[in-house]
A protein has these predicted regions:
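A nucleotide-sugar donor-handling region in carbohydrate enzymes
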Residues: 51-54, 62-149, 178, 285-289
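Membrane-proximal helix-turn-helix segments that form the acceptor-binding/catalytic region
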Residues: 15-17, 57-67, 159
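Donor nucleotide-activated moiety binding/catalytic core segment of transferases
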Residues: 11-23, 178-227
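A donor-sugar binding/catalytic signature common to diverse glycosyltransferases
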Residues: 25-51, 203-250
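A short beta-strand/loop micro-motif in the catalytic core of glycosyltransferases
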Residues: 26-27, 65-71, 90, 171-173, ...
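Short, small-residue-biased leader/transition segments that mark boundaries at the very start
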Residues: 2-7
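C-terminal alpha-helical cap of glycosyltransferases
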Residues: 301-316
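Catalytic binding pocket for nucleotide-activated donors in carbohydrate/polymer assembly enzymes
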Residues: 189-191, 224-297
């Protein structure tokens, strides 16, 4: 059936309850347990925020009729994660992939602005998973360094990385995970390392997955964004200096998670600098590995939004 007007309402407000109780289809990406229960003929579709490498740390209450995953390999892992049947899991990929694959002129202009301001030629997006969360129960005590960020153990390492990027005309944009407490780099003057939060993107009229599209490479670790980024077929680097600690603390959904990380495996600053040089020089050693992992982790299509709408017979 067709969709009418679109309204924005803040959750847990009276109007939000009204629409939640009367809507036929409810799409969401985070917990929707505040509504209490579904009504007859309602469908709750959890778009979810991503499938990555990390095993489940805390039990989750299933409150959906369907949940999306990028590909069939994640059906088994999410059955265990949510404690649900395979029938509730749809390997359609995420609607936000359309935005990531298409990009936007706004994002391209924002990238040009950042590169010009820093005298840089390429932009590496760094998206670490959270270690110290705003909620203590979610903390991952796997790093013990000054800034609570991988590889950068102290101010000397931070300034070394900044100098190396400046000399090689590379800009690193660190995008904080929304659960991570803010990074504090103190009074260190950084020319080629920029730190962004969601509000910075919003102030420039951007959504995160628009901005991801304009990056020349991605640095991550165990975050699901690395799986998403495979669709762009661009270089990936994985910071793994707390891999052993994370194995003990959280564990993995794959028996050998490193096999599903098709990119530079970085354990120290020298590894990171080598990755930066490869990006500068257009060197890509992992294209075939990315293709192999992408085939296992994604159910690729041309229009992810339309795939979801078609499944539920929704026309617009």
């Amino acid at each position: 059936r067709g969709l009418g007007d679109v309204y924005k309402r803040q959750i847990r407000r009276a109007e939000a309850y009204k629409y939640a109780l009367t809507s036929k289809y409810i799409f969401y990406t985070q917990a929707f347990n505040w509504i209490g229960m579904s009504r007859r003929n309602q469908l709750f579709i959890d778009l979810w925020h991503g499938c990555g490498y990390k095993a489940n740390k805390n039990g989750r209450k299933v409150f959906f009729d369907y949940c999306l995953v990028p590909g069939d390999i994640f059906i088994k892992t999410k059955m265990k994660f949510f404690g649900c049947t395979s029938k509730k899991l749809l390997s359609f990929g995420y609607p936000r992939y359309d935005m990531m694959l298409k990009g936007s002129e706004r994002a391209d202009e924002y990238k040009k602005k950042l590169l010009k301001e820093t005298d840089s030629e390429k932009l590496i997006l760094w998206m670490p998973t959270y270690r110290h969360a705003s909620s203590e129960r979610l903390n991952e005590e796997t790093l013990n360094n000054e800034f609570n960020i991988p590889i950068i153990d102290d101010a000397d390492k931070l300034l070394e990385l900044n100098k190396f990027c400046k000399e090689n005309h590379i800009l690193i944009v660190i995008k904080k995970h929304y659960l991570q407490v803010p990074y504090d780099f103190g009074e260190n003057v950084l020319t080629n390392i920029v730190y962004l939060e969601n509000r910075d993107l919003a102030d420039n009229g951007l959504q995160l997955y628009e901005f991801i599209n304009c990056s020349d490479a991605l640095v991550s670790d165990y975050s699901s964004v690395a799986i998403d980024y495979l669709l762009l077929d661009r270089p990936l680097g994985f910071t793994l200096d707390d891999y052993e600690a994370y194995t003990e603390s959280r564990g993995w959904v794959f028996d050998d998670p490193l096999e599903y990380m098709p990119g530079e495996h970085m354990y120290n600053m020298q590894d990171f600098e080598n990755f930066i040089l490869d990006i500068k020089n257009g060197k890509d050693n992992y294209k075939e590995q990315r293709a192999s992992v992408r085939a296992k982790t994604h159910n690729v299509c041309d229009n992810y939004c339309q795939r979801v709408l078609d499944y539920f017979n929704i026309t617009m």
